């Protein structure tokens, strides 16, 4: 299972725009070492691993507390909490899948999708659950939401750093491949014929 090709292209273009370091003139390492460099982030992968086991505990805790306080909530907050639980569950499954695929297989579009889902959707939702006192927040809820928020903040930072490394390596490889191609097939007469080529035909004509 992979992302649709149009979405992959859009995420790839977004990554090149946001994460490319324009100040970087070339690779920091020799080409052989750069080719063998592992770009996957171990801290990010460990965070995703523990997140996979933590999320069911968070879900069960949140559903249990929602059931207990449901009668005292207003209809407005009842609707919001049920909607948030459904959306958070769906987003988290997709988010963790993209994180695993993007980090382990060094796929930029998948990791960019993971980063965007974490930053723009999941983190704001968890902060809403953590700080909105109208939800009648219980101690267990606050505890699991704080842990979840810490996971998300760390993953946003770690994924950002990893994406910058991946995109810059891809950009470096692209420029090196272009340079090698020009060396193998040099573009001659780029600015017109050289002086020697202009002089030789004139000399070969001789006097009339």
Curated annotation (Swiss-Prot):
Q: In terms of one coarse class, where is the protein primarily found?
A: membrane
Q: Which domain of life is it from?
A: Eukaryota
Topologically, how does it sit relative to the membrane?
Multi-pass membrane protein
Instruction: Kindly give the Pfam families that the UniProt entry links to this protein.
Output: Transmemb_17
GO biological process, alphabetically ordered: cilium assembly; non-motile cilium assembly; smoothened signaling pathway
Keyword Lyase belongs to the record = no
A Gene Ontology CC term for this entry?
Answer: ciliary membrane
Alphabetical list of InterPro entries matching this protein: Uncharacterised_TM-17
What job does this protein perform?
Transmembrane component of the tectonic-like complex, a complex localized at the transition zone of primary cilia and acting as a barrier that prevents diffusion of transmembrane proteins between the cilia and plasma membranes. Required for ciliogenesis and sonic hedgehog/SHH signaling.
Please give the family membership noted in the entry. Answer: Belongs to the TMEM17 family.
Protein name per the record: Transmembrane protein 17
